[in-house]
């Protein structure tokens, strides 16, 4: 989504309103706002100026998109015009996260059997998220409220959803019995999502493949339903000829999908730079974004393999969420770098959580690794939320709009 939403008064004017659009801020609201806001604005004046000039560009369509368009068009017409697009997105994300956390609660090591209704809830939660995520842009155009903030918010929610979706899938097939495969599948998912925006940072255009997010989500929904129908015996059954367990089949599909997608992504990354001398949209090296995701995956792999207490094997869900929050933040920063045509800096507070785990192992687990993992999880989550809230509030204030509310006023022109 791009363009401009309806205007509003800035926070701090004669009738101060919260940037998130919930009206007058109470004392508690002010305290929370300070707690979840960075001490200094994350974006510079020049970045905000370039953000205003940003225009959303996409190319291609996936296999199922034409079939789903009719349903999405029908669904968006059922949504009241006063509901903000970002509110639609955050509702879908919240449902997706809550249903996945149910599975995490029942299956903390991804080897247990959850109640059947939990798998059904997870399948429904993912379908709801897919549906709402697909119509937020349509709602923005329908209400003439498109903005760069809407595009950023949409991608930000997707980055977090990716973490929970891949984790929920691994739990559904009980992949915790094969920790190496679970590690690969979870980090392959976040890596591919990062690469999708990496090539956008290079080329300026978000490209969709024949097999893309919609198709993968439908496949995952089917796997949740198979967990309901077949249960553990189904995933533990052997595939004839291949002589592997059924649960390994989705992992092999992930390998194939990673190779296929990354081939297309890196073709664009190495040849599609729109900046000077084939550089990124910001004029930086096309390889520079690799340092961030490469650091995350390298740290995750080293800590996994060097743990003396089998930290990942015993607590895979906590581990994936910890590094997933880190990946989500650096992906969000990549999206911001693309939309503001700016450089990505490697130094980031997102790496503090993984660094704590690494240093604890370096000093022979001076503190119980499980305790440090919880500290890293909480810090990484707080760091992600703090950054996202700060960016959204700053952009909303700059564009004179609300994050979660459409203000009735003279509509601005659409760019999406």
UniProtKB/Swiss-Prot annotation:
The chain crosses the membrane at residues 89-108, 116-133, 156-176, 180-199, 210-230, 246-267, 286-306, 315-334, 349-363, 368-388. It catalyses: CDP-ethanolamine + a 1,2-diacyl-sn-glycerol = a 1,2-diacyl-sn-glycero-3-phosphoethanolamine + CMP + H(+); CDP-choline + a 1,2-diacyl-sn-glycerol = a 1,2-diacyl-sn-glycero-3-phosphocholine + CMP + H(+); 1-O-alkyl-2-acyl-sn-glycerol + CDP-choline = a 1-O-alkyl-2-acyl-sn-glycero-3-phosphocholine + CMP + H(+); a 1-O-(1Z-alkenyl)-2-acyl-sn-glycerol + CDP-choline = a 1-O-(1Z-alkenyl)-2-acyl-sn-glycero-3-phosphocholine + CMP + H(+). It comes from Homo sapiens. CDP-choline binds at residues 86, 151. GO terms for cellular component: endoplasmic reticulum membrane; Golgi apparatus; membrane; nuclear membrane. Homodimer. The modification Phosphoserine is found at residue 18. Residues 1-20 are annotated as: Disordered. Glycans are attached at residue 144. This is Choline/ethanolaminephosphotransferase 1. Its EC number is 2.7.8.1, 2.7.8.2, 2.7.8.22. One of its GO terms (biological process) is phosphatidylcholine biosynthetic process. Mg(2+) 1 binds at residues 133, 154. Changing residue 215 to A/D: Induces a strong reduction in enzyme activity without altering diacylglycerol specificity. Changing residue 169 to N: Decreased cholinephosphotransferase activity. One of its GO terms (molecular function) is ethanolaminephosphotransferase activity. Catalyzes both phosphatidylcholine and phosphatidylethanolamine biosynthesis from CDP-choline and CDP-ethanolamine, respectively. Involved in protein-dependent process of phospholipid transport to distribute phosphatidyl choline to the lumenal surface. Has a higher cholinephosphotransferase activity than ethanolaminephosphotransferase activity. The record marks 151 as: Increases basicity of active site His. Signal peptide: none annotated. Gene3D superfamilies: 1.20.120.1760. Pfam families: CDP-OH_P_transf. It comes from the Eukaryota. Ubiquitously expressed.
């Amino acid at each position: 989504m791009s363009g401009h939403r309806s205007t509003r008064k800035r926070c701090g004017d004669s009738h101060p309103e919260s940037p998130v659009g919930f009206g007058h801020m109470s004392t508690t609201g002010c305290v929370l706002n300070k707690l979840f806001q960075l001490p200094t604005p994350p974006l510079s004046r020049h970045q905000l100026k370039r953000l205003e000039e940003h225009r959303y560009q996409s190319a291609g369509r996936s296999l199922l998109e034409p079939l789903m368009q009719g349903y999405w068009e029908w669904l968006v017409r059922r949504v009241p015009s006063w509901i903000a697009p970002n509110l639609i997105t955050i509702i879908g994300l919240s449902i997706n996260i809550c249903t996945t956390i149910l599975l995490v609660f029942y299956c903390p090591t991804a080897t247990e059997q959850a109640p059947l209704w939990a798998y059904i809830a997870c399948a429904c939660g993912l379908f709801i998220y897919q549906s709402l995520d697909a119509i937020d842009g349509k709602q923005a155009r329908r209400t003439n409220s498109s903005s760069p903030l809407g595009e950023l918010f949409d991608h930000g929610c997707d980055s977090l959803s990716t973490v929970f979706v891949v984790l929920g899938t691994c739990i559904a097939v009980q992949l915790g019995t094969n920790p190496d495969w679970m590690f690969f599948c979870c980090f392959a998912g976040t890596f591919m999502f990062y690469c999708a925006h990496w090539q956008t940072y290079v080329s300026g255009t978000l490209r969709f493949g024949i097999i893309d997010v919609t198709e993968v989500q439908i496949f995952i929904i089917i796997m949740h339903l198979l967990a309901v129908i077949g249960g553990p015996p189904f995933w533990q059954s052997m595939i004839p000829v291949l002589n592997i367990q059924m649960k390994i089949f989705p992992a092999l599909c992930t390998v194939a999908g990673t190779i296929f997608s990354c081939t297309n992504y890196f073709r664009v990354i190495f040849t599609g730079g729109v900046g000077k001398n084939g550089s990124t949209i910001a004029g930086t090296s096309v390889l520079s974004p690799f340092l961030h995701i490469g650091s995350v995956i390298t740290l995750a792999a080293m800590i996994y393999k060097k743990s003396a207490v089998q930290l990942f094997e015993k607590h895979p869900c906590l581990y994936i969420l910890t590094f997933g929050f880190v990946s989500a933040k650096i992906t969000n920063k990549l999206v911001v770098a693309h939309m503001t045509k700016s450089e990505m800096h490697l130094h980031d507070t997102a790496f503090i959580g993984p660094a704590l785990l690494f240093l604890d192992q370096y000093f022979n687990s001076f503190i119980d690794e499980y305790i440090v993992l919880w500290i890293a999880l909480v810090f990484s989550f707080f760091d992600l939320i703090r950054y996202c809230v700060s960016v959204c509030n700053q952009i909303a204030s700059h564009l004179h709009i609300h994050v979660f509310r459409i203000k009735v006023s003279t509509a601005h022109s659409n760019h999406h």
